[in-house]
Amino acid sequence: MSAPARLILVHKQRTSAMIRFLRFPHGIVAPEPLPKLAELMGEGEQVEGEAVVTHPAMLVKNVATMLGLSEDDIALEGGFRAHVDTPEGAAPVYLGSLTAIDPPYDAAECSGARFIAITDARDLPPAELGLLRRAYECVME
């Protein structure tokens, strides 16, 4: 059994290398929040029933549309993939980089979201903090 995929959005400033994550009112994943009982699965942990994997392009398109952005405004980070154990099954989580020079503040604001530094995420649930840590490591590599 597989749960719907989620996407974390990050913006890395090209000139200053400042890293910001897009935080929605419900947390850091889009298009919908993780369930309260969600737990981050270990890296390399086997996911049952994942013989067929859905390509994340539709997820990127849906999130871009939700934010009023173009699909080209979000680039998938190929080096990142995580899974979160939920009551519905394992939910794949991808990392998308916002490609604009500056973060799309207006698009974020229209969605009720805001850009935060990783240090401003201390109040997130443990699963989301773990996802942020892995995403940050991926972006810094």
Regions found by a protein language model. Name each.
Residues 2, 13-66, 70:
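Conserved Nudix-box catalytic region and its N-terminal flanking loop in Nudix hydrolases
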Residues 2-4, 33-45, 103-141:
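Nudix hydrolase/Nudix homology domain
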Residues 13-15, 97-103, 118-120:
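Short loop segments at secondary-structure junctions
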Residues 56, 60, 87, 125-129:
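A structural signal for well-ordered alpha-helical scaffolds and beta->alpha junctions
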Residues 68-80:
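A short coil-to-beta-strand element that immediately follows conserved catalytic motifs
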Residues 70, 99-101, 139:
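Solvent-exposed amphipathic alpha-helical surface segments
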Residues 78-108:
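Active-site-adjacent beta-strand/loop module that shapes the phosphate/pyrophosphate-binding cleft
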